[in-house]
Structure formats: C-alpha cells, structure tokens
Amino acid sequence: MTIESYIDYTNLKPDATPNDIIQLCKEAKQYRFASVCVNSSYVPLARRELAGSYVRIVSVVGFPLGAVASSIKAAETTFAIANGADEIDMVINVGQVKARNWDYVADDISGVVKARSEERRVGKEC
C-alpha cells in the first residue's frame, strides 16, 4: 500500500463551494486517496462525484465545536449516512468533557452510534 491510500482528503471550510468539493473528489480519485472528509451538507454531492470509485466518504457531525444538542448530532448522522457517507467523525462536547460530565458525553456518543447503526453502516467513534 502507498501512503496515499491512508490519506483522508479534507475540505471542512465554512465557505467551501460545490466546485471546491467537486475538485476535492476529482483529486481524491486522481491521487487514490482513501477518503474525502466533508461537511454533511456536501455528502450527496461527494457521493455523486465519487460514484463507482473506491474513495470513501467521511462526514463530520457536530463540527466544529461539538456543542450542539445530541439530538442534532444524531439527526446529522442519519442524514449523512442516508445520503452516502461511509464513515462519521463526531466532535464531542468539549465543555462537557472539561466538566467531567461523563454521562452526558457517553449519551452524546451513543446517540450518534445508534443513528449510524440504524442506517446499517459501520464507522468509527471518536
């Protein structure tokens, strides 16, 4: 395996345009990167651009701060998976970690895992 096959090629800029994501996908295929990582709103576009390729689609949820409600993260996960995401990268609520509110953190993660599981996909939990 080459180093390229380990790269998650990412564009999470808040001002990323559809053309930026199309270019990201084109380059990911060209250089044989493992995956592209995009905001959930761009998962459907990435899926169309990467159709028939081996490049996986990673979607972030709760990005960038992790401070949204757990139910929002679960809904974002459901949307991303339903629209073609192969993997979910979740941002946990750092404030709750700092407060050592482990029950909240566990419930936050569990909500995303459950939403992902309901869509019958396997991803990684962060």
Question: Over which residues does each language-model region extend?
Answer:
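Conserved, mostly hydrophobic/aromatic
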Residues: 8, 46, 80, 125
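Glycine/small-residue-rich loop that forms an oxyanion/phosphate-binding "nest" at active or ligand-binding sites
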Residues: 59-99
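Active-site-adjacent beta->alpha loops and helix N-cap segments on the catalytic face
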Residues: 18, 38-55, 68-72, 95-115
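Conserved beta-strand positions in the central sheet of alpha/beta enzyme cores
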Residues: 34-37, 87-89
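Conserved small/polar residues in nucleotide/adenosyl-binding loops
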Residues: 119-126
